């Protein structure tokens, strides 16, 4: 079964609230087998809308990544991100 990538592009508008999101989300992602590959590092924007924070996490499968997003723990995290950020998130299955 191929692994999956969780790719988020984020503009933070409230650092205090977003830091609560990040702490809880980090735990939820780990609980579902996710590991961070990139998290807020340097980047070059080539196309589309610029977001200054970019995050990539790898999960064991598309199902695991989706289960993480739908989990109560991650939804708790999202309650802190709403109103504290503008976000785009896509989950993509990796090519085998």
Where are these regions (language model features)?
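C-terminal structural segments of small proteins and small subunits
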Residues: 62-90
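Short S/T/G/P-rich N-terminal loop/turn motif that feeds into the first structured element of a domain
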Residues: 1-53, 59-70, 93-96
